[in-house]
């Protein structure tokens, strides 16, 4: 570590900025993001990880520690609070609060070539939609806040180079003497060295060994649903009636599954990343719950004014050989129902990008390409555009939110109908996980294939896209199948990590899944 040159740069940066990064980079061999979290877990707030070797989207994992600022919504306003919970600022919109933060803290971004070097990390609940659209709130009040957390310490793990970048932001008031700046620098440098030293220590971590039982189907024993099956089937028919009447083209009806758990959220995550690896994986500690997820689908990416959405619709299980994969891909691209749904979602994405893009800049450089993931293949297109001048990147995020793949089309009418039918507010399901960088860049994924873990209960929500020729029983089964990978992860985690009998309740089992 070249501390003297770093100090010289730090003092120079302090002339123009109040929040200055100190960066140290190490190269590792056997260390993994999982081991880093285990060794530093008392301080960890989130792990954002890419885990799908066959996907070109996967390269970086990001770990956040020591929150200093939380941005959350409260009665249609956004509030910034410090680590002690003291209210610092209130604004009408998230983008206004982010702009205040940028001005207040005068943050310098580090000169390092990675997509995220620090910023706000968090989630937007699906139930945010009444503040963005004319859709009325769900009849049952949502219990979850929208929140983004800013952290002074971040670790970026580059899986391609095996470099681990430690970024420590140092906050100044702007009135320090040079001696005070040097002391502040040395204190942060010491914290960095202590953190890196911890990574050399041994950790008591139970090895995750999965055997042949990975291939067994998930059990729905002790799993309950918020939706009565008979009502779900009736609501599928209702949506088909609205489609025949011309109100909508598609509606995504969902149900929530609850299952008791006795293992930790991070143990659930460790198994999920093996059972269902995806380009967007996350373990997040929130105020009243943890989120554990493996989403395959980007919501929107904004970098230096370039916007990108990846509509996904159309799915087949992977084959066992290249030849079988090729045959399945051909069948998928010839399936008229799958193609029609995909075309509709591409049009939705073009519309979402078009609202915030320069006129004439929206394009579809990749159209209906079959991409292989670990267990499935999807039809994917890419829609791009150039952000309008003087338009905030957060406006692009809000334009795409919520994803049409989780609502149906047209979005507004579909969301209105879903709010009338679904028995509970969606909360995190169908929302997004996002990072909003200090540099204004954004990456986000749709909150699907996700567990919300609270009070020893894991909640999993899954939906089915209802179209004119949908068979109600098949749509019910589709929601059960989509929840299956996460239920399997829970049951494997209980088998591997639990030192006591699994937590049970007296709720009836869903025997029909």
From Swiss-Prot:
EC numbers for this chain: 4.1.3.27
GO BP of this protein: L-tryptophan biosynthetic process
Keyword list, A-Z: Amino-acid biosynthesis, Aromatic amino acid biosynthesis, Lyase, Magnesium, Metal-binding, Tryptophan biosynthesis
Name of the protein in its database record: Anthranilate synthase component 1
Binding site for L-tryptophan: 50, 279-281
Enzyme class at the top of the EC tree: lyase
Function: Part of a heterotetrameric complex that catalyzes the two-step biosynthesis of anthranilate, an intermediate in the biosynthesis of L-tryptophan. In the first step, the glutamine-binding beta subunit (TrpG) of anthranilate synthase (AS) provides the glutamine amidotransferase activity which generates ammonia as a substrate that, along with chorismate, is used in the second step, catalyzed by the large alpha subunit of AS (TrpE) to produce anthranilate. In the absence of TrpG, TrpE can synthesize anthranilate directly from chorismate and high concentrations of ammonia.
Single GO molecular function: anthranilate synthase activity
Activity regulation comment: Feedback inhibited by tryptophan.
GN (gene name): trpE
Cofactor comment text: Binds 1 Mg(2+) ion per subunit.
Cofactor: Mg(2+)
Record's catalysed reaction(s): chorismate + L-glutamine = anthranilate + pyruvate + L-glutamate + H(+)
Superkingdom assignment: Bacteria
Annotated chorismate binding sites: 314-315, 429, 449, 463-465
Residues reported to bind Mg(2+): 341, 478
UniProt record similarity statement: Belongs to the anthranilate synthase component I family.
Signal peptide region: none
Pathway field: Amino-acid biosynthesis; L-tryptophan biosynthesis; L-tryptophan from chorismate: step 1/5
Subunit and interaction comment: Heterotetramer consisting of two non-identical subunits: a beta subunit (TrpG) and a large alpha subunit (TrpE).
Pfam families, A to Z: Anth_synt_I_N, Chorismate_bind
